[in-house]
Curated annotation (Swiss-Prot):
This is Heptahelical transmembrane protein 5. It comes from Arabidopsis thaliana (Mouse-ear cress). GO terms for cellular component: membrane. Belongs to the ADIPOR family. Expressed in roots, leaves, stems and flowers. It comes from the Eukaryota. It is found in: Membrane. PANTHER family: ADIPONECTIN RECEPTOR PROTEIN, ADIPOR/PROGESTIN RECEPTOR-RELATED. The chain crosses the membrane at residues 80-100, 192-212, 229-249, 257-277, 289-309, 314-334, 348-368.
Length: 374
């Protein structure tokens, strides 16, 4: 009996060394993956991921795409960088849809034509004539016209006299001459849509960059260049609406300023393609380049103020433009100086570090510019 049991035990199939090794490899691979997908500290990063030595921990390093995409819902030092601009992207997408459906795209000439007769009979024609001649050329959109007509002196007249009829005839001719060019060249809104498109592209590119850059060196290089292109696009297109609408009656300066800021934006994108542009030593250079792009818009703003210094609309818009510039400029300073994390390294790894503040200021500046464009 003992010999028989021993023979059965000997005949029982034994696990091969290859099978045992495979099990150990699978177990080891799972353990390695678990360790690999953990967040690491700055000193463990490859060189291409080292950007801010004041952010000590909570880095993702060379994760696979699937894990990176899932990390959008987890906590790490890029979480708020992704979401601040991703929320901004959806916000500007909604504003673009709202603008296309709610804000008039051209001068409502037909509405103006039907409403003018009644309005003319209810206003002081002398005041109307002088106001239209002095203010309409610089603000030809229909809501400006209607605002002017409604805000003329409230005197009413029930019986037209010869003087009123002469003024009415003069107003009719002058108004026709002023609005006639708009029939053949209606006021376009492409500059405003260009700005909205630039903002959408910038915010989406930024979110994508912060989410995917930790995958590999090649992906990081591509994503960062896309991010720089988005910043240049936002800055350049931000000047399209104020330049176009301020100088639409002066094609030379309109084309000059639009061409200059466009060429400057393209040049900035080309410079950003250089590998050295991403190095730590060029951090201040990067911020200065984008700051210089924004500062170049000071020329058309001052030019506009010289021409329309007595127009309330121009002063109102300039106020918003100055606020926008301050927000963008403050963002560039925070980005370059890496405040506040340089004061307390490691304390702002998850929330409150300079790049997150920079993102918030960019979105605030873009929203300010949107309000100015309305």
């Amino acid at each position: 009996m003992g010999d028989e049991a021993e023979i059965k035990e000997h005949l029982k199939p034994q696990a091969s060394s290859e099978t045992i090794d495979k099990k150990h490899n699978v177990k080891g691979k799972r353990l390695w993956q678990k360790v690999k997908y953990q967040l690491v500290e700055f000193h463990s990063l490859p060189a291409y991921l080292r950007d801010n030595e004041y952010i000590i921990g909570h880095y993702r390093s060379e994760w696979p795409i699937k894990q990176i995409l899932l990390s959008i819902f987890t906590i790490h030092n890029e979480t708020l960088n992704v979401w601040t601009h991703l929320i901004g992207f959806f916000l500007f997408l909604a504003l673009t849809i709202y603008t296309a459906t709610k804000v008039p795209s051209v001068v409502d000439l037909h509405s103006l034509q039907h409403r003018l007769p009644d309005l003319l009979r209810k206003t002081d024609l002398h005041k109307l004539h002088s106001e239209l001649m002095s203010r309409l050329p610089s603000s030809p959109s229909s809501w400006h016209v209607m605002d002017l007509l409604y805000n003329c002196l409230p005197e009413r007249f029930s019986h037209g006299n010869y003087t009123d009829m002469c003024v009415l005839h003069s107003v009719r001719e002058d108004l026709a001459n002023l609005i006639a060019p708009l029939i053949f060249r209606p006021i376009t809104r492409w500059p405003f849509y260009a700005f909205l498109g630039g903002a959408i592209f910038c915010l989406l590119a930024s979110s994508t960059c912060h989410l995917l850059s930790c995958h590999s060196e090649r992906v990081s290089y591509i994503m960062l260049r896309l991010d720089y292109a988005g910043i240049a696009a936002l800055i350049a297109t931000s000047f399209y609406p104020p330049v176009y609408y301020s100088f639409m009656c002066d094609p030379f300066f309109c084309n000059l300023y639009l061409g200059f800021i466009t060429i400057l934006g393209i040049a900035t994108v080309l410079v950003s393609l250089l590998p050295v542009f991403q190095s730590l030593e060029f951090r201040v250079v990067r911020a200065s380049l984008f700051f210089g792009m924004g500062f170049s818009g000071l020329a058309p703003i001052l030019h506009k103020l010289i021409i329309f210094w007595d127009q309330p609309e121009a002063l109102h818009m300039t106020g918003y433009e100055i606020l926008m510039g301050l927000l963008y400029g403050l963002g560039a300073v925070v980005y370059a100086t890496r405040i506040p994390e340089r004061w307390m390294p490691g304390k702002f790894d998850i929330a409150g570090h300079s790049h997150q503040l920079f993102h918030v200021l960019v979105v605030a500046g873009a929203l300010t510019h949107y309000r100015a464009g309305l």
